[in-house]
Design a protein with these regions (language model features):
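Active-/binding-site microenvironments in catalytic and ligand-binding cores
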Residues: 1-180
């Protein structure tokens, strides 16, 4: 009736497509607002992982030809089709997850951003695994983006990728708008 609309938003910092900051797992005190914008964009390789990925440990061998193409500073997007499970309990409870081997490989190769379709890079029901995988990646300086969707629509094996988080002061993470 006044000619305008406005809404109040209440968001969990790790809802939907989101990014984790090192503070999230106590790796350091670095928060989401302290990252430079350059950390959120660049060339990304799309690894298409076929088949049923339910509860699968994702390994370096699953990357296929991408394994030898990725250069230091490139990003890696893992297309598993898992975003299609978003309305099932399996989305959270039976997700494909990053193995220690793949996490360590990403650090050694200097991956800039690791993007996945599930809501986490590790089993959310196993705190030890969840903490271990996040810590390997975050201590290695890798930006983690979780909850991606529509990766199957990306053409080609590499894209220019951006995942821009809300600049939440002191945030342990934030929702992002991801585009490629």
């Amino acid at each position: 009736s006044d000619g305008w609309n406005a809404s109040t938003l209440h968001l969990y910092s790790h809802s939907g497509t989101h990014m984790d900051a090192p503070l999230h797992f106590g790796v350091s005190q670095e928060t989401i607002d302290q990252y430079p914008l350059s950390a959120f964009m660049g060339r990304a390789w799309v690894a298409r992982i076929p088949g049923d990925c339910t509860s699968k440990w994702l390994q370096v061998k699953d990357l296929g030809a991408i394994e030898n193409k990725l250069e230091r500073g490139d990003s890696l997007l893992l297309q598993t089709g898992w975003s299609h499970h978003v309305n099932d309990s399996s989305y959270r409870d039976a997700l494909p997850r990053i193995s220690d081997e793949l996490a360590e490989w990403c650090v050694e190769r200097g991956v800039k951003i690791l993007g996945v379709e599930p809501p986490s890079v590790a089993n959310v029901n196993d705190l030890e695994e969840l903490s271990r995988i996040h810590r390997i990646l975050l201590m290695g300086g890798i930006v983690i983006v979780e909850g991606l969707c529509n990766l199957e629509n990306l053409k080609g094996e590499s894209v220019f990728f951006m995942a821009l988080p809300l600049k939440v002061q002191g945030g342990d993470g934030a929702p992002v708008r991801a585009i490629a």
